Structure formats: structure tokens, C-alpha cells
């Protein structure tokens, strides 16, 4: 199979679809890999590293797309839609529930789009989302602490406090991978940490995991309001696979927060959980202030630590990429059901129900689409 690795063009997206070691694994199995020149530079992988791994370096974006399968990190931007073609396998993060134009373009061009974030194991876990959730979760506390500093617009709070001075209060909405990792860093900094989640079993697991060092609270509108207004830092870490994020924190709740407090919306690439995160920000200009509260709404947080992120992502995605390349998508879906759940569009059909419902597209089951 001919596989393309284009350079990411989203603002400050420094990750790359495959590391040289991933390229080597695919080339070793007889596949041809085309890497756009400088695609790996943001992650400190040189063209020469890819050439040594067996890749062919191409000097035009179009050549990296003129392949059987494209492996990326982030969803294609509008300038890349012109490269879509029938039967192209696109393997990347898509977050289509927040991307109507992209969904339409994938359908119109009959692209076989497989979203990392909807590949799902029988236990409900999301193996290709996990590494980036870990990165984003850990980063969310770090950037929150940074923007609590006075010269960054915050109220001048040190999350860990000092003897005789109260600790900063961190509230995390969502106790999944991202929320759990946010809590680990917040605890490490010495903050007072509360996690809200709708799943009582998950709250029990978090109690055990953190040995009672975090406060675990059932997530409902009253509790969210109560804890949000008292917090110095609120982190939104809620995920419904393939669906738009629920709006859990209202504008009125934000108005009750202290001036100079900070919110970090990890879920912004799925629409966000805060009513006031009504725009996506970038690493170049990561925050804005509304009702006195600093809003951080960067959709590609792991792009700021690309070396760690690329290697972690490659570790997770490579076995699935090899399966697709070695067996073809039909056989790969047959032998690996979790991978088949990643299929979002196929031959002009939307095959993810959450995406179809969000934009009123006709839904076609994966089984029916593949007949």
C-alpha cells in the first residue's frame, strides 16, 4: 500500500502522523511511505531520519495526499479538501461532531475516514485517544497554573499555596483519562482538587486511585454551580465518543466565578463544555477574558509538546495502521471490531450515529455500508 504523511498545517500543530520508527515498521512490511518534506521538523524529526527509515521525501503537499492511505494527526483543514478522493483511507483525529463542513466534504468525495477518537475497545476505552488525553490532561493543569499568574491575566494564585496561605482550588469536570491526569498534576502541585463525574462507579475508582486525596462529587447542575464558583481553576474534561460535548457550565455560572480565575476547556475540539468558550483559540493567542474569567480554549493542546505527543500517538496508532495496510480496510474491520468503530464516513455515507444526528445526515450502519 502507498501511504502518505503530510505536514500538519493547523496553527502551531507540531506533531506528525508517524515517527521514523513507525515508517520503518511499515516499510519493513513492504509498504511505500511518502513523507512531505519537513513534516517531522516540529517534533525534531529530520527528513534524513525518515529517509534512513525507508521513506521517500516529497516536496509537494499534493504528493503526500496522492496515496492509498493518509495518516495524520489533526482533522484536514479546508485547504486540504481538494485532495480528497474516492476510496482514500484517511486515518486521523477527526472530531466530526464539531465539523459540519468537513463531514460534508468527506461524504461528497466518498472518503473512507477512520477517526482515532472513536476506535473503541469492548470495555469502552478509547485506545487511540488515551495518549493524547493523558497529555492534554496533564497540560491543562500546567497551563491553568500559568494563566493564574498575575501577568498572564490571572488573580495571582499559586496552586500549591505556602504555609499559612490557602491552596488553590481546582475543579475538574469529567473523571476520564484527561480529568484523571489533570488531577495527578494538580495534586502534585499541592492544590485542593475536586473531580465531578456522572458515573458513581468511576467516582469509586477515583477514590481508590487517589487514596482519598481528591474530593469526588456526583456531577449535576447544582453541584457544578457550587464548585465552579468557588474555584480558582476549572478544567472541562468531558467526552462522549464521536458526539458534541455537552454544555455543562452556563454563562451565569461563569459570571459567579472570581475575577482572575481560569477555565481550561479540553473538550473544545468537540464544542466545549463551557457556554462561554464560544470560540477556539490557538497556541499563538491561547486565551481571552470574559466576565473577568480567563478562558483557555486551544483545540490542539498536545501540539505544544510534539515530541512526547508524536511518540505516544505513534505507539498507539501504529498497530492499527499496519493492520489497515497489510490486510486492507475490509479485512481489517472484520478481524478487529474496535477498529471498525472508528469508521465515520464510507462511500458517501455517515457511519457514526452521533455525527449523523448532530448534523441531520442520514445514518448508515457500518455493517450496511460495507455490504
Curated annotation (Swiss-Prot):
Pfam families listed in its UniProt record:
AlaDh_PNT_C, AlaDh_PNT_N
Recite the UniProt keywords alphabetically. Answer: NAD, Nucleotide-binding, Oxidoreductase
The Enzyme Commission number assigned here is 1.4.1.1
This entry carries the following GO cellular component terms, namely:
cytosol; plasma membrane
**GO biological process, alphabetically ordered:** alanine catabolic process; L-alanine catabolic process
Signal sequence span is none
User: What are the catalytic residues?
Assistant: 95, 269
GO MF terms listed in the record are: alanine dehydrogenase activity; nucleotide binding
- The keyword tRNA-binding is annotated on this UniProt entry: no
EC category: oxidoreductase
Which family is this protein grouped under?
Belongs to the AlaDH/PNT family.
Q: How does it assemble?
A: Homohexamer. Trimer of dimer.
Put simply, this protein is called Alanine dehydrogenase
Query: Per the UniProt entry, what species is this protein from, by scientific name?
Result: Staphylococcus epidermidis (strain ATCC 35984 / DSM 28319 / BCRC 17069 / CCUG 31568 / BM 3577 / RP62A)
Amino acid at each position: 500500500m502507498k501511504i502518505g504523511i503530510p505536514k500538519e498545517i493547523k496553527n502551531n500543530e507540531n506533531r506528525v502522523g508517524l515517527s521514523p520508527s513507525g515508517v520503518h515498521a511499515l516499510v519493513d512490511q513492504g509498504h511505500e511511505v511518502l513523507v512531505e518534506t519537513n513534516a517531522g521538523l516540529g517534533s525534531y524529526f529530520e527528513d534524513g531520519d525518515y529517509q534512513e527509515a525507508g521513506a521517500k521525501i516529497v516536496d509537494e503537499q499534493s504528493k503526500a495526499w496522492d496515496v492509498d492511505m493518509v495518516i495524520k494527526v489533526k482533522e484536514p483543514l479546508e485547504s486540504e479538501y481538494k485532495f480528497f478522493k474516492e476510496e482514500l483511507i484517511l486515518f486521523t483525529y477527526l472530531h466530526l461532531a464539531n465539523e459540519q463542513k468537513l463531514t460534508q466534504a468527506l461524504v461528497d468525495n466518498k472518503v473512507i475516514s477512520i477517526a482515532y477518537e472513536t476506535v473503541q475497545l469492548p470495555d469502552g476505552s478509547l485506545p487511540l485517544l488515551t495518549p493524547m488525553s493523558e497529555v492534554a490532561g496533564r497540560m491543562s493543569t500546567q497551563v491553568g497554573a500559568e494563566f493564574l499568574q498575575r501577568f498572564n491575566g490571572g488573580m495571582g494564585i499559586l496552586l500549591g499555596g505556602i504555609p499559612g496561605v490557602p491552596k488553590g482550588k481546582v475543579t475538574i469536570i469529567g473523571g476520564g483519562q484527561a480529568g484523571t491526569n489533570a488531577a495527578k498534576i494538580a495534586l502534585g502541585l499541592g492544590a485542593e482538587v475536586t473531580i465531578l463525574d456522572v458515573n458513581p462507579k468511576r467516582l469509586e475508582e477515583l477514590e481508590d486511585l487517589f487514596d482519598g486525596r481528591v474530593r469526588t462529587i456526583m456531577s449535576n447542575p447544582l453541584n457544578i454551580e457550587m464548585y465552579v464558583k468557588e474555584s480558582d481553576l476549572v478544567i472541562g474534561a468531558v467526552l462522549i465518543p464521536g458526539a458534541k460535548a455537552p454544555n455543562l457550565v452556563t454563562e451565569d455560572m461563569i459570571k459567579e466565578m472570581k475575577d482572575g480565575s481560569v477555565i481550561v476547556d479540553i473538550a473544545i475540539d468537540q464544542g466545549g463544555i463551557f457556554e462561554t468558550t464560544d470560540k477556539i483559540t490557538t497556541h499563538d493567542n491561547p486565551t481571552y477574558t470574559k466576565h473577568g474569567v480567563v478562558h483557555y480554549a486551544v483545540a490542539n493542546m498536545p501540539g505544544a509538546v510534539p515530541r512526547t505527543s508524536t511518540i505516544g500517538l505513534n505507539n498507539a496508532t501504529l498497530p492499527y495502521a499496519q493492520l489497515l495496510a497489510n490486510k486492507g480496510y475490509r479485512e481489517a474491520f472484520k478481524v478487529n471490531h474496535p477498529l471498525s468503530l472508528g469508521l465515520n464516513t464510507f462511500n458517501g455515507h455517515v457511519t457514526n450515529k452521533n455525527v449523523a444526528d448532530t448534523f441531520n445526515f442520514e445514518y448508515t450502519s457500518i455493517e450496511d455500508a460495507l455490504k
